[in-house]
UniProtKB/Swiss-Prot annotation:
Pfam families: SRP14. This is Signal recognition particle subunit srp14. The keyword RNA-binding applies. Gene3D superfamilies: Signal recognition particle alu RNA binding heterodimer, srp9/1. GO terms for molecular function: 7S RNA binding; endoplasmic reticulum signal peptide binding. One of its GO terms (cellular component) is nucleolus. Belongs to the SRP14 family. Residues 86-106 are annotated as: Disordered. It comes from Schizosaccharomyces pombe (strain 972 / ATCC 24843) (Fission yeast).
């Protein structure tokens, strides 16, 4: 569902809060640059999407002129809702790297 920039930020906040209160599920965020069509004279824009499984998909198109202001608000929303993130366990990957490098040089 394509929303205005303000509506997108409100819906994204609601979506992240819903998942945080449930304690399960994932929200995927993506960005894609839209190329400039020289024939139409339009400016460059960025498509930003948020997806919560198959249940809810929201998106907005941000014009390059408003991108800095929008991205500051977008970052605040995301940072405010990342409380539930788990720190990645890197111990396993470090052990695997040591095994491959030490066994490779005999």
């Amino acid at each position: 569902m394509l929303l205005s920039n303000e509506e997108f930020l409100k819906k994204l906040t609601d979506l992240l809060q819903t998942h945080q209160s449930k304690g399960t599920g994932s929200v995927y965020l993506s960005q894609k640059c839209n190329p400039v069509d020289e024939g139409e004279g339009s400016s460059a824009s960025v498509l930003i999407r948020a997806k919560s499984g198959a249940a809810e998909k929201i998106s907005t198109v941000v014009e390059l002129d408003y991108f800095t202001d929008f991205f500051q608000s977008y970052a605040e929303v995301c940072k405010g809702q990342i409380v539930g993130l788990k720190k990645r366990d890197r111990k396993k990957t470090k052990k695997n790297k040591k095994k491959t490098t030490s066994s490779g040089h005999t």
